[in-house]
């Protein structure tokens, strides 16, 4: 079974705002909407190093003091593949904010983000980012995403 590793990072500034990326749809990946920066783990790269690299590429910021928040696990029964997205958060960063080919980036309050056009399933990703008793979400392609609590119970 093929497994793909990815990452996503929630960055919070001193005013409590989060760095949001308005991801643009692409023919190879139609996933779009408000989300956090992140991407794929390259061969031979650690997950943490991939977060630092992806955030820098997509936002211009260099992050540090990353805290692991949990992960999202997707299963595709047609392709017999799985996809893991490791979630991190931090409030430690430096650099100048810049947009990238992935989308525009801007600081927003969580309420502003939630009122916007979220990327698919982003509300469930946020639950894992923000709740220590929900370390995982699990989904089957085309069937949605379920939260998983510390006892392995789907919610």
Residue ranges and their predicted role:
Residues 13, 72-96, 124-129, 133:
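Active-site-adjacent beta-strand/loop module that shapes the phosphate/pyrophosphate-binding cleft
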Residues 17-53, 146, 151-155:
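Conserved Nudix-box catalytic region and its N-terminal flanking loop in Nudix hydrolases
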Residues 129-155:
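Charged phosphate-binding loop/patch that engages nucleotide di/tri-phosphates or the phosphate backbone
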């Amino acid at each position: 079974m093929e497994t793909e590793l990815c990452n996503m990072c929630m960055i919070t500034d001193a005013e409590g705002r989060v760095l949001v990326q308005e991801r643009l749809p692409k023919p190879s990946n139609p996933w779009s909407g408000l989300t956090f920066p992140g991407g794929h783990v390259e061969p031979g790269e650690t997950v943490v190093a991939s977060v630092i690299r992806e955030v820098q590429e997509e936002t211009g910021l260099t992050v540090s003091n990353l805290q692991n928040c949990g992960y999202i696990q997707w299963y595709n029964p047609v392709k017999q593949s799985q996809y893991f997205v490791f979630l991190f958060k931090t409030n430690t960063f430096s650099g100048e904010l810049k947009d990238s080919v992935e989308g525009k980036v801007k600081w927003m309050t969580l309420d502003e983000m939630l009122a916007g056009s979220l990327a698919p399933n982003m509300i469930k990703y946020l639950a894992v980012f923000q709740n220590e008793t929900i370390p995982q979400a699990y989904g089957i392609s085309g069937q949605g995403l379920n939260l998983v609590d510390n006892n392995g119970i789907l919610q």
